[in-house]
């Protein structure tokens, strides 16, 4: 079997992958999604000797019939089954040691995770200096919002429409 340092690293990797993506997980049990992620990230599933389908089949074999998760002991059984398939020319013990070395000390990778986009349309929408029309009146020169003063239309109840320029000159034109 694998050396004690490999076993400790293997258990640590099991716990890290078991809690990945689930803030409520205890790290004692791993679901099928995280098992598949572990096999893919640690290069156990290489796409040739071991495929994603093989990984799912082994998971289904080792878990209990009604269970949806595996514990650490079932995890080791699953690795033994995959080890002989992944490393065909080696004995069972050598293959298990090799697969333990692939997994020991690894963490879930965040490759392919979507990053915040900062170009094109997003830049125009978040830069207040580029606002036009009535929206630019809602912000001062520094880009800070003016609050209610920037949003509130002051009611002009003088009787004139807003575009009329000669407000207040009618009485001067008409003599009484």
Curated annotation (Swiss-Prot):
Q: Does the keyword Acetylation apply?
A: yes
Family classification: Belongs to the TPPP family.
Q: What is this protein called?
A: Tubulin polymerization-promoting protein family member 3
Protein location: Cytoplasm; Cytoplasm, Cytoskeleton
PTM N-acetylalanine: list the residues: 2
Concerning PANTHER family, the annotation shows: P25 ALPHA-RELATED, TUBULIN POLYMERIZATION-PROMOTING PROTEIN FAMILY MEMBER 3
Give an example GO cellular component term for this record.
perinuclear region of cytoplasm
Biological processes, Gene Ontology terms: decidualization; embryo implantation; microtubule bundle formation; microtubule polymerization
Is the Cytoplasm keyword given for this protein?
yes
Which gene holds the coding sequence for this protein? Tppp3
